[in-house]
Amino acid sequence: KAAVLYETGKPLIVEDGIEIPSLQSGQVLVKVAYSGVCRSQLMEVRGNRGEDAYLPHLLGHEGSGWVVETGMEVTKVKPGDKVVLTWIKGEGIDCKGAKYKLGNTTLNSGGVTTFSNYTVVSENRCVILEEEVPMELAALLGCAVPTGAGIVFNTLRPNKDASIAVFGAGGIGLSAILGAKVHECFRIIAVDIEDEKLAMAKEFGATHVINCKTENPVKKIHEITKN
């Protein structure tokens, strides 16, 4: 069973009876436990990114699950392993996206798809999870966390005296705030239009919050940073 995008701007359609393709060398069959819903995927469904050249298309690029079976040459994971599913290419074999069948219709997928009960992915799209990590949280490790925290760790690389402002306290923004907290940044400023998200940002490590519906964020940031 999977959610299929047949036409941009239209709702996904949940289809049953989809045929799982046979594993090729370097591929892994995973039973999906949880999937994140990335903003970029919503944009694709709505058609905000232009026409989808891969219709009908299986979507979802961040999730968690259990390895069911591995193809030839796969050494990174084995059946029973808990894994994160991610669009980010890691270690291991890289393969083309699997093609699924629904009757006579071919359903396309990218390197990973998670809006489904089962998914066939490349070995390099699986990351083994420690047993104690909850599956529902692990799903976010496939995109939101490495995107947000990764910007802080790999691009900004702030020192402890740094002030950081994060606009938008969604999954990526909160992950960036976490990254700034790990770096022990002096000021971590969260900006959003929803008080509920700003409250969560404080739980994640924001030292200051700004609701830009009621305050001028640029002026307020200057006041907070005193420059």
Predicted regions mapped to residue ranges:
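Residue-level marker of beta-strand positions
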Residues: 62-64, 82, 118, 163, ...
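Hydrophobic/small residue at the entry helix of a nucleotide-binding pocket
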Residues: 147, 172, 180
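Cytochrome P450 core scaffold surrounding the K-helix E-X-X-R motif
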Residues: 39-46
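Adenosine-nucleotide cofactor-binding segment
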Residues: 166-169, 181-227
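Glycine-rich beta-strand-centered segment in the early N-terminal region that forms part
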Residues: 19-35, 48-92, 130-133
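NAD(P)H dinucleotide-binding glycine-rich loop of Rossmann-like/cofactor-binding domains
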Residues: 89-167
